[in-house]
Amino acid sequence: MEEMGSILEFLDNKAILVTGATGSLAKIFVEKVLRSQPNVKKLYLLLRATDDETAALRLQNEVFGKELFKVLKQNLGANFYSFVSEKVTVVPGDITGEDLCLKDVNLKEEMWREIDVVVNLAATINFIERYDVSLLINTYGAKYVLDFAKKCNKLKIFVHVSTAYVSGEKNGLILEKPYYMGESLNGRLGLDINVEKKLVEAKINELQAAGATEKSIKSTMKDMGIERARHWGWPNVYVFTKALGEMLLMQYKGDIPLTIIRPTIITSTFKEPFPGWVEGVRTIDNVPVYYGKGRLRCMLCGPSTIIDLIPADMVVNATIVAMVAHANQRYVEPVTYHVGSSAANPMKLSALPEMAHRYFTKNPWINPDRNPVHVGRAMVFSSFSTFHLYLTLNFLLPLKVLEIANTIFCQWFKGKYMDLKRKTRLLLRLVDIYKPYLFFQGIFDDMNTEKLRIAAKESIVEADMFYFDPRAINWEDYFLKTHFPGVVEHVLN
């Protein structure tokens, strides 16, 4: 890797397009750039909106109105909003169409003239998303952003944020290698993205011709996403369509400098702008959220399963450092970076319920009725057979008994029946969604990322400012003092 220059000097007077601007990772990226380099020229933030007014409202409510920006607000005081007004341009549009669906011709031409960096953070991360929606956003959306980037006259780098789990359910060491057009995970030949698109269109046309309801079409599209993903070897539609998106970028990048960032499971901020900021219920947060509420009594996980976690601020820092490291590197093979912890600082999945028990026993969640929710120790099952036995005895059989009793006694037990049915559905849904990762035996190789860390430490004075070494994390300390309190404050409350 070539010697890196100063990150702050690189960001100075640069114009950056950020897609998916209302997403949590994009917000952390925006906050970091504005706080660390106030001399950045412009941040163009793409938000899904049809007009300027709607976009401006979303920008305030979903981005700068968030607590995430409290440190920047404290630093700038009364000048915060004038600073944001000067440095940020809201862009109403969508990554699902040509030229990002921009209607303002003058703004579009300004962006093509001014933009130096494009960072694509837009995605739908729903594991059970409709196939048509996921294909449009995660796959073709990436291509639309690339096409827009190619029209930017001053472009120095295009950074695409994907996910490490495009690897599917591989075992052993998973290398930081790109995906090329037509590659499937199970060795099946004939994977063609355009064919997948045509299959979706044909199915929707067939359903509409038959007079299917929107609810029926939605359900069919969700089922189709799962079926097509598994047909080619991926466990769910999210990672499948993200892999397809990478294939399109590799196929059509041309001479554009491209870097692909593949984070693992993203958790709350480790240090900046303050520890513990998290937004929404992400993958791993289902455990503390449902356990803290007293709704999760058991958990299924392999005894040797390593859960690969990485705080969001480290992902953003790695993205910025990679952006600087590969700027202006045209006609070279794009470098892919795994940003995770399983290789450098692994944590066993089985430690999670134990830490959750310790935290919520000492710090019970206070429910909306102002009552503390007392939790018991969750049962942890290390195999599907023991879990299925538990499920049958404690949920499926009682559910069947209540169903029969309801029929005999004119719905007398309806309340209990519906409550148990909800709990059963929740448990089955969580297991189905996360089943591929509960016994995951892969370790994400981070050799490229380690080289990037070394290059940053050797070449730039701001290496400590843009930290992303997971070896700095004590997982027990992080969960008990940072992540769980953050989930309670920003999600549960």
UniProtKB/Swiss-Prot annotation:
Recorded GO MF terms: alcohol-forming long-chain fatty acyl-CoA reductase activity; alcohol-forming very long-chain fatty acyl-CoA reductase activity
Protein's job: NADPH-dependent alcohol-forming fatty acyl-coenzyme A reductase that catalyzes the reduction of fatty acyl-CoA to fatty alcohols. The recombinant enzyme accepts saturated and mono-unsaturated fatty acyl-CoAs of 16 to 22 carbons.
Family named by the database record: Belongs to the fatty acyl-CoA reductase family.
Keywords tagged on the record: Lipid biosynthesis, Lipid metabolism, NADP, Oxidoreductase
GO cellular component: intracellular membrane-bounded organelle
Protein name per Swiss-Prot or TrEMBL: Alcohol-forming fatty acyl-CoA reductase
Lineage summary: Eukaryota, Viridiplantae, Streptophyta, Embryophyta, Tracheophyta
Reactions accelerated catalytically: a long-chain fatty acyl-CoA + 2 NADPH + 2 H(+) = a long-chain primary fatty alcohol + 2 NADP(+) + CoA
Organism for this UniProt entry: Simmondsia chinensis (Jojoba)
